[in-house]
């Protein structure tokens, strides 16, 4: 399994390198170094409120790997793989061109303040699952035969709801968007089965441990509706609050920019953007209104926004792109400290 994982990572790096994304790789490496330093210096510092005991939350949070160094290393590896996965899919589906450097560079810096918040390993798992869900979702709009992509996207998205019940809105909105886009019964069945499979697997594993299916579902439902002791906004540092508010503002303006040039965009980009807009708005509303909203919801909001902010770099000049990116990166680093 380790060899397969390394080969997959090498394939992603080489695929991005063929598109002349060296700047993005360098950015990712620099951001990773900063992330390692932040994880080492802020161990145990919970930036915002912790999430409730959802099905797999306690397992991930209590996981021990012998030392904090190993846990930090695993977190960094998940962070790198997630960024490369999302960036590679935007290139191969032609959502963004190879000249835009933005997908890999933006994802790496925009996620930095969220990964280094609270339980870093849990946040890295959420980012990894969402990256695979979004990557497979992009392929669903670019290929006629995408049965396996539909299934893989929904399995990854639905696993988010098992990891953290407050993220249930992600698979629900993605499923509705994919069913509406594909409009075929066979593919709708694949979406529904993929969405239910992770929850069934969790209930089955709990059943093997003498916990009934109904009790497992009841635990998941309580995790979804049970309020946190602290609202995520009440315990949010000012720098991260400013960062998230600014990202939400930029995402809203990027939608206007996308709609103003909609006729020149491909059908793949239009379909992907509609789905990301739906997921972004739904996740943001849940983060503000859902009693059980955890910090993972804010991570989802920032990650979806980072994939959409690349719109700013498509037609902008090189100088403006550099200045804008440096400003965004500076804000992200300041929010992560």
Q: What are the residue ranges of the model-derived segments?
A:
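Membrane-interface alpha helices of multi-pass inner-membrane proteins
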Residues: 149-163
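Juxtamembrane membrane-water interface segments that cap and precede transmembrane helices
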Residues: 51-66, 217-241, 255-258
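Transmembrane-helix signature of polytopic, membrane-embedded enzymes
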Residues: 90-110
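Membrane-water interface signatures at transmembrane helix termini and the short loops
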Residues: 258-317
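Membrane-interface transmembrane helices that cradle and orient dolichyl/undecaprenyl
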Residues: 133-148
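Aromatic- and kink-enriched transmembrane "portal" helix at the membrane-lumen/periplasm boundary
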Residues: 105-124
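Perimembrane helix-loop-helix junctions
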Residues: 170-196
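Transmembrane-helix motifs of polytopic, lipid-linked glycan transferases
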Residues: 77-93
């Amino acid at each position: 399994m380790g060899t397969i994982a390394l080969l997959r990572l090498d394939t992603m790096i080489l695929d991005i390198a063929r598109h002349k994304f060296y700047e993005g790789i360098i950015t990712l490496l620099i951001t990773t170094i900063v992330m390692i330093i932040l994880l080492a210096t802020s161990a145990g510092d919970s930036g915002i409120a912790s999430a409730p005991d959802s099905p797999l939350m306690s397992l991930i949070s209590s996981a021990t790997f012998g030392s904090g160094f190993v846990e930090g290393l695993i977190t960094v590896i998940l962070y790198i793989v997630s960024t490369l996965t999302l960036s590679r899919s935007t290139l191969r589906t032609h959502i963004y061109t190879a000249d835009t450097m933005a997908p890999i560079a933006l994802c790496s810096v925009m996620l930095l303040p969220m990964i280094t918040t609270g339980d870093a390993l849990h946040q890295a798992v959420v980012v990894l699952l969402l990256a695979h869900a979004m990557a497979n979702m992009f392929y669903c709009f670019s290929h006629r035969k995408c049965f396996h992509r539909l299934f893989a996207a929904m399995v990854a998205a639905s696993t988010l709801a098992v990891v953290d019940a407050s993220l249930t809105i992600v698979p629900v909105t993605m499923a509705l968007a994919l069913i509406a886009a594909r409009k075929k019964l066979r593919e709708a069945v694949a979406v529904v089965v993929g969405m239910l499979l992770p929850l069934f697997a969790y209930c089955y594993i709990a059943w093997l441990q003498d916990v009934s299916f109904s009790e497992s579902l009841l635990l998941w439902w309580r995790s979804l509706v049970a309020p946190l002791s602290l609202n995520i906004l009440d315990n949010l540092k000012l720098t991260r609050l400013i960062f998230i508010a600014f990202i939400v503002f930029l995402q809203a303006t990027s939608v206007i920019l996308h709609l103003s040039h909609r006729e020149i965009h491909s059908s793949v980009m239009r379909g992907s953007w509609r789905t990301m807009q739906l997921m972004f708005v739904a996740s943001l509303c849940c983060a503000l209104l859902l009693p059980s909203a955890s910090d993972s919801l804010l991570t989802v909001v920032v990650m979806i926004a980072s994939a959409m902010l690349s719109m700013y770099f498509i037609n902008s000049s090189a100088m403006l792109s550099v200045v804008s990116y440096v400003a965004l990166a500076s804000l992200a680093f300041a929010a992560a400290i």
